[in-house]
Amino acid sequence: RRAWEADALVYMTSGSIDVAISKLDKDSPDYYKQMQRCIEDHSIESSICKNVGSEALAYCVDEGVQIFGGAGFIEDYPIAQMYRDERINRIFEGTNEINKLIISGYALKKAILDEIPIREMILLRSDFGINDSSNSIQDLIEESQAVEMSRTIVLNVLNDLIVAYGQDFKNDQFLVENFAEMITAFSIMDTGIKKIKNITNHDQKRFTLPVLKLSILVNYQEVLSKSKDICDYIENHNDSISTLSKIDDCSKLVSFSESKIC
């Protein structure tokens, strides 16, 4: 599952960057500045890719060491080098904690500059987005609803954070980390749904569906959990009315269990 999620995110992000750059005029005198701007516009997605990818590798290699047992720490076996090399991935190219600062910081910046019109989007999603059929796929109706509900929750939580803290939000480590993990979980779900839409091979889709269902199950629960933590924190530190009631409504409207995966 983790490897599939990382693969989906990286292909989506790199493809989006390629499309954006392909639309630029190569004869323009500021072509490279425009290219840099295109890449910077994908800062959130790139940071998510780095975090998800490095943590997926960390999990897989750690399981590999467990399989090798004590031999996993002996240099004669390849897993020992993998374990050592993997650990640095979460440190260089921006530690994963710094990437979480980037994710939350850029989301805040885009919302304040109205690049993400969150208030208008919230008003349009009074039904939590469950009636939005644009992402719905046969056999994945409930999963599609979970993605749209998660989108609504992320928008509401970001709005609450801005109302309660303004730009000071980025200075609170608890809020920054939890909100970044919320965005990451939602991005995995949203990208997964889009990826499976593009699979035309019947057998490939049949084998991929359980992976996607498990991915959405895990990440939907992550969105609900992190959003509740953030809203509880806001209520304890600020008089702002949070979106806790909406989160509770969402969790009642769509409930997952492992039995629904297969």
What do the PLM-derived regions correspond to, one by one?
Residues 1-262:
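Flavin-dependent oxidoreductase catalytic core characteristic
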